[in-house]
């Protein structure tokens, strides 16, 4: 996929379907953010009476016989002194939506004068590219006649030398191949994206990139490893579970290793603690954590980062049936810790627990980061724009927060309240899998933390229940699967671990 190109000269630009022109907002009025020919000013000067240049505002105009592009989009970037990376990201995502609805395929984008901004040309271009790439996406549909919007096919960014721009654009395109993989997996029918399908995708990645190795455990191997919690959740499903291990060796001589774990519940009915229909209808997205890990590995291998990373995906359906695991029963995890089942709809933490135990036994991790659409309580707490995360290590938490801020993928650190751990008490087992009806996200994280046992490994848990899937478009993401987390984690690993 090569979509974005850079061109230093305005005069030498190629003909295109559309031109995007940037504007600041000053005193509630639009102010030109770049110098253009008088022919273009004649096109847009009358439109400025109804266009203020505020963040993300657009105006769609038609050119004339003297303009090289016949469609012109005015794009507001807000006050120049307040522009941030997120402003740029969301503005160019909005412009991409407008351009695609106008059925444009080739686009010229004129950069604003960046020297007066608080951040670098590189940061501006990175966020511009991310905005365009994020909304140049179609989720899978099943119409008899395809009604999807056409893609942008060539976007030329003017005002930057190719040596600088093209390097940034190639990197972002590689990164978004991972984002698109994550989105496609989450958006596709649950009957298609089974545990076996996730395993097949992991195998395909290992076949594509020599730096990746893959190991797949079937039900028999899962039982042999004594992963009783994953096996319990899988009991009621007609589809077979899989335990997927991906390994990336980007720095073989280093002992530093990051383990990424993704919850892979390919459909969650709630089990015998059956979800109501309205809550179940989107549950094909309950494997978004697994899809995020696969997307990260796609980008990681493509970018050839000099780090060592292991990805672990416990994958199963949580189905209702006569063989399904039961509330009130006790099941034993990989290390011998026993769990009384208070709800079969709290299954994600069970399979993550066995994955954490596996990582500690076999991977010698420096840090563990897990991704899971784990609790509705997190959606109540932070909504759909911010993912909550928990961490037992302040350095890891600080670095994740910084990567979040710099990519626009919002994370907010939540507290591991030690007092709440007592809510997991069981009279007949080492713990229950649910607490009381309060602080549900915190008690879920505390449950996972118990499976670290006495290991001092740095650990973070990202609850992406609200951010992984949106039922309406919310910039800079399209409708449905967002691919949230891929960009943030790649940036985190590149900035803080690739040394």
Swiss-Prot record:
Mn(2+) 2 binds at residues 263, 268, 286, 347. It catalyses: Release of an N-terminal amino acid, Xaa-|-Yaa-, in which Xaa is preferably Leu, but may be other amino acids including Pro although not Arg or Lys, and Yaa may be Pro. Amino acid amides and methyl esters are also readily hydrolyzed, but rates on arylamides are exceedingly low; Release of an N-terminal amino acid, preferentially leucine, but not glutamic or aspartic acids. It is found in: Cytoplasm. Its cofactor is Mn(2+). The keyword Manganese applies. Signal peptide: none annotated. Binds 2 manganese ions per subunit. GO terms for biological process: proteolysis. Keywords: Aminopeptidase, Cytoplasm, Hydrolase, Manganese, Metal-binding, Protease. Its main location: cytoplasm. InterPro entries: Leucine_aapep/pepB (IPR011356), Macro_dom-like (IPR043472), Peptidase_M17_C (IPR000819), Peptidase_M17_leu_NH2_pept (IPR023042), Peptidase_M17_N (IPR008283). GO terms for molecular function: manganese ion binding; metalloaminopeptidase activity; peptidase activity. Mn(2+) 1 binds at residues 268, 345, 347. Its EC number is 3.4.11.1, 3.4.11.10. Belongs to the peptidase M17 family. Presumably involved in the processing and regular turnover of intracellular proteins. Catalyzes the removal of unsubstituted N-terminal amino acids from various peptides. This is Probable cytosol aminopeptidase. It comes from Chlamydia trachomatis serovar D (strain ATCC VR-885 / DSM 19411 / UW-3/Cx).
